[in-house]
């Protein structure tokens, strides 16, 4: 990643998700950067336009904090709903940034975490199907399986974006930047 392409705090960026074959998967039109370093990007968004690969659009329903790390093969969306905080974790390539957007490859597997701390691994069938269709290399499969384990450990240990202080700090920072 080029250092100049790291987004700065307060900057609004697009997030583009791709599939392994290079096709666009999903685009979030606007996310406000709360922290941008070469290793970690934290952003916030609320009622953001999302465009699917088939052109369909929808708008996110609630405020969310997004977490990307350059060394892990996952990203995390922390969604603030009336009944608590939900997490949607995408198994994905580490992020890359350029002038156009923050970008990553979505590898189908997801983990949904509920406010009570319980979680479920989702879309294993889709992962198997796409692994065969798009010829995911064996090394990628090993990396992704290892990162599922890491992600589950983080969830259980309340580490990284799952730590209560993480949510408090970044939700407050997003509110300040947004209301400024």
Swiss-Prot record:
UniProt key word Magnesium: yes
Keywords attached to this entry: Hydrolase, Magnesium, Metal-binding
Residues reported to bind Mg(2+) 1: 90, 106, 110
Residue numbers annotated as active site: 26 (proton donor)
Disulfide bond entries: none
UniProt catalytic activity: a ribonucleoside 5'-triphosphate + H2O = a ribonucleoside 5'-diphosphate + phosphate + H(+); a ribonucleoside 5'-diphosphate + H2O = a ribonucleoside 5'-phosphate + phosphate + H(+)
Keyword Metal-binding listed: yes
Free-text function comment from the UniProt entry: Has nucleoside phosphatase activity towards nucleoside triphosphates and nucleoside diphosphates.
Stated family: Belongs to the Ntdp family.
Name by which UniProt lists this protein: Nucleoside triphosphate/diphosphate phosphatase
Classification lineage: Bacteria, Bacillati, Bacillota, Bacilli, Bacillales
């Amino acid at each position: 990643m080029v250092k100049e392409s790291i987004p700065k705090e307060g900057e609004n960026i697009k997030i583009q998700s791709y599939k392994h074959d290079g096709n666009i998967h999903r685009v979030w039109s606007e996310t406000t950067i709360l922290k941008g370093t070469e290793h970690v990007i934290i952003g916030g968004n609320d009622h953001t336009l999302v465009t699917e690969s088939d052109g369909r659009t929808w708008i996110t329903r609630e405020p969310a904090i997004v977490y990307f790390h350059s060394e892990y093969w996952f990203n995390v969306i922390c969604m603030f709903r009336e009944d608590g905080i939900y997490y949607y974790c995408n198994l994905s390539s580490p992020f890359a940034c350029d002038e156009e957007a923050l970008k990553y490859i979505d590898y189908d597997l997801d983990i949904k975490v509920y406010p009570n701390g319980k979680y479920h691994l989702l879309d294993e069938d889709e992962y198997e199907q796409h692994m065969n269709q798009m010829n995911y290399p064996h090394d990628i499969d090993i990396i992704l399986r290892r990162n599922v384990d890491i992600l589950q450990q983080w969830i259980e240990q309340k580490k990284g974006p799952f730590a209560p202080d993480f949510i408090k700090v970044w939700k407050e920072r997003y509110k300040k930047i947004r209301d400024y």
